[in-house]
Amino acid sequence: MKRKGLSVFFFLFWVALAAQSSETQPVNSVQLIAWLMAGVPSGRLVRIVKERGIATVPGKDQIHQFEAAGAAANLLQALAASKPSKASSEASEIPTSLLKAAADAKAQRFHAAELDLHPALTADPQNAALHFALGGMLIRQEQWDDAFDEITLATQLMPDLPENHSSLAYIFYRLDDGPNSISEARTALSIDPQNAEAYQFLGLALYSNGQYAAAVHAFAESLARDPANADTYYDLGITLRAGGNQAAAITAYRQAIHLNPAFWEAHSNIAVVLHEQNKLDEAIAEYREAKRLAPEEASVRNNLGNTYCDKGDFDAAMLELRELYRQHPEWQQGHGCLARAYLSKRDYANAIQELQVSIRQNPTSSSEHRMLGEAFVLDDKLEEGIRELRLAVRLNPDSDSAHHFLGTALFQQQQLEAAEKEFREALRLNGSPDNHYSLAACLMTMDRYQEALSELDAAARLDPERTLYRARREELVKLMKETNSR
């Protein structure tokens, strides 16, 4: 990993120096279009023009170039109404390669935009805005080390631009370096206390550090300055959920959708919260909307399939997951859910196949080995089932269901003492009626009727509505009387 940051002293030194130099220097069209293509909002660029001035007023051709690059109406109006700064009257042509890069960035062809920027940087290697633009393209490709290098260069060349520091804050956040991320975001805010993006990235950094209340406050400060930012509401929703406030999280996600109706990730995250609340029908509706907006997104179809499984709608689950693997054969999740669907259809062969795939991807999952063992037992493959169930117990000795199913398999193999041991361990871990009943069945087979009767009494006492327990108790009492009368 490359060096993760410059010292706070280094930045404060350059910021102090910048107060005497960069702060009074007007910006030019090259810088503005480079910042624009890297994602700096038009409203923020308007403020930069007002604060710093502009070297030369763009002509009609350049205004059209800004419009083609994605400038909003407020920036176009500000440029057209601007007056040249007295500090400079030098014209600034926008390089063709930069215009091409801006067009590619607008079309989300980020790698092409990255390549387009190289000629412009070769011609002007000390241009901080061009390094910032290149860093922005690398960020969008998640090339964090290279992005760090470019944004660091931009910061060294123009240390008083808060966007340089907030971009570093975001890179550090993605590198899971919360302290440096917080430091950079606060540096950005020390330069520009009204910078909404810096507050947003401060919120992300605090969230990554587990400081949820402070993160919520930072996001609120960001939204106070940029209330139409759907991404910030989305980040706020994630943080509120992490802090345990599910209702507020859903409200934040819905506000993100209000601002950006195509925000499928927000629909998906609402569904996650609803699933956690066991509101499965509502969760399914949100996942379906996310799927409508992003039909090729594998995670949405996977989560929708799993929610159908939890609801017990195995036909719908199978449709979703089969389509998922058709679209994305490389996708590795969801095989356990598909196995459950096959088990519900008593299609043990396909269930076993899916569980074996799932176990290859996660060999230490006790629950997957337990399900595979159960499938083998149901398919009358007791030896294979016992092997998997013993492994499930070793991986998670505190799983009552693993002990229960292992006991069941051993019982079917007439290994009664071993089965009794597993049933008793399952009962120790979970005193459920079914665990009492299974132990009773084992004890009855071993002719230990009095002990079996005690277990059946316990099962019936715990679940008096279950007629099976009472019926089996009556059978046992009758059997005991017949045995005693002989």
PLM region descriptions:
Residues 7-16:
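Bacterial N-terminal signal peptides
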Residues 108-115, 141-153, 174-187, 208-221, ...:
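Structural signature of tandem alpha-helical TPR/SEL1-like repeats
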Residues 123, 157, 191, 225, ...:
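Structural marker of alpha-solenoid helical repeat scaffolds
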Residues 94, 128-129, 162-163, 196-197, ...:
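Helix-start (N-cap) detector for alpha-helical repeat units in TPR-like alpha-solenoids
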Residues 19-122, 129, 133-136, 140:
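General marker for long, soluble alpha-helical cores
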Residues 445, 453-486:
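Terminal, low-structured helical/coil segments at or just beyond the last alpha-helical repeat
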